[in-house]
């Protein structure tokens, strides 16, 4: 047998290396996962539903255990403070601290010290979806019940329920205030606007184009979890969801979802549904997507967000492609009529009228514009700069897995308007902050402000007046 030459050894080495790369390539791809959801479902629907329904109690117990570990969920409304239609506003800091820790001692530490000690409050970590592994639209029970009552359309999921207590959610149904008819005040008549009553409520108040836009906003179309295929999370085939199922009465009912613009699943942020009030003064839409008009966002929602940003799945389940020049524009025109709720203590410039405001509210306003640095981003009169900012909260903690959500860097997030803020709890983009008191404590740490207890209370009082 002839000895193998140097050239032959080199060729053999390259061949073996190529085999190794071919073997490792698929393994690495499998480890990384795919951007796409499976289109062909191998399991029959009855088996899927039975399996997920059996898992549901475990899923919900894990999420509720997390909420109780993170928060004080008791009923403690703020005396004399209510939302626009009368629902009590919950007060006090609800995020729990580790034993032996105080807010003052935390505020005295640097981000590096808090990170090293692992003392970042549990309630300040990103809040996972109640079922992070699947995500998807998950509605509060009171929303589901009212839509069943009016339309017979069931938004119950057999695999998961909404998690946050009703105490900490916006009032339902919310008031509707129109920029074109401020003389009418709340035009909702205390009703949830649906396809079954929108015409009788708004005929004679809106023009025909706006009325058509509202009709489309309350018309259901297929969505990732609610559709007619075997890949759904409703017991029966579903007609889908409407824009106003989440943005109830043009406001928010706190329905949750996951952002569609991130992969893999453990990195996807929970979404707290934002209000549509005041979209006429906003120029950025989506917490991170930076869409530039409400027309863009309206079109994007049904083309992509309804289906987790997956156009392949959207084609299978029935994406509703809106026509830009008529349908999208009509929907956007109605949305642009949705005004902020009345704020009787604010003057023309969006600042407090000293003749109407309390001493505490005026002190809070001075802090908001000065020491607390709030107005750097949340500038009057609508308390937004129409921009995006990265708070870099990951300075304070090491990445960790929380119920399937990898808590790490969030990146830049849109500056949402604070006008009418008491009407739209919970707070932050993923609803991790249950009250305005929680929100002030969060930013006191993140911005390293070292505010006193009195200063923090003054800030809350000011925001309740917006």
Question: What residue spans do the PLM features occupy?
Answer:
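Periplasmic c-type cytochrome electron-transfer domains
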Residues: 27-466
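Bacterial N-terminal signal peptides that target proteins for export
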Residues: 2-13
């Amino acid at each position: 047998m002839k000895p193998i030459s140097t050239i032959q050894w080199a060729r053999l080495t390259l061949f073996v290396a190529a085999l190794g790369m071919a073997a490792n390539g698929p393994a690495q791809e499998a480890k990384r996962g795919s951007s796409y959801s499976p289109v062909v479902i191998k399991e029959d629907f009855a088996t899927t539903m039975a399996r997920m329904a059996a898992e549901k109690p475990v899923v919900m117990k894990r999420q509720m255990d997390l909420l109780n570990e993170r928060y004080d969920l008791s009923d403690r409304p703020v005396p004399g403070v209510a939302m626009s239609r009368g629902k009590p506003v919950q007060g006090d800091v609800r995020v729990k601290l580790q034993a032996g820790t105080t807010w003052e001692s935390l505020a005295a530490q640097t981000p590096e010290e808090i990170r090293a000690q692992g003392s970042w409050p549990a309630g300040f970590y990103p809040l996972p979806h109640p079922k992070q592994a699947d995500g998807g639209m998950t509605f509060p029970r009171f929303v589901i019940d009212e839509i069943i009552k009016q339309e017979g359309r069931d938004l119950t999921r057999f695999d998961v329920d909404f998690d946050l207590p009703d105490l900490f959610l916006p009032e339902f149904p919310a008031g509707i205030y129109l920029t074109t008819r401020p003389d009418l005040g709340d035009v909702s008549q205390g009703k949830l606007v649906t396809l079954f009553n929108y015409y009788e409520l708004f005929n004679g108040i809106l023009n025909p184009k706006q009325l058509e836009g509202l009709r489309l906003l309350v018309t259901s179309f297929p969505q990732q979890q609610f559709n007619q295929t075997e890949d759904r999370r409703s017991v029966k085939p579903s007609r889908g969801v409407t824009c106003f199922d989440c943005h109830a009465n043009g406001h928010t009912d706190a329905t949750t979802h996951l952002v569609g613009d991130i992969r893999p699943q453990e990195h996807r942020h929970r979404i707290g549904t934002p209000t549509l009030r005041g979209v006429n003064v906003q120029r950025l839409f989506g917490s991170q997507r930076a869409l530039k008009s409400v027309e863009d966002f309206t079109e994007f929602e049904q083309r992509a967000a309804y289906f987790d940003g997956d156009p392949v799945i959207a084609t299978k389940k029935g994406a509703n492609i809106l026509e830009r020049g008529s349908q999208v524009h009509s929907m956007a025109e109605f949305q642009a009529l949705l005004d902020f709720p009345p704020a009787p203590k604010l003057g023309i410039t969006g600042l407090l009228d000293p003749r109407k405001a309390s001493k505490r509210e005026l002190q809070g306003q001075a802090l908001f514009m000065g020491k607390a640095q709030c107005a750097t981003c949340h500038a009057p009169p609508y308390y937004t700069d129409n921009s995006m900012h990265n708070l870099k909260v990951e300075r304070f903690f090491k990445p960790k897995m929380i119920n399937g959500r990898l808590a790490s860097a969030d990146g830049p997030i849109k500056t949402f308007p604070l006008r009418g803020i008491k009407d739209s709890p919970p707070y932050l983009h993923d609803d991790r902050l249950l009250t305005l008191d929680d929100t002030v404590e969060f930013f006191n740490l993140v911005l390293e402000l070292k505010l006193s207890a009195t200063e923090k209370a003054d800030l809350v009082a000011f925001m309740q007046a917006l």
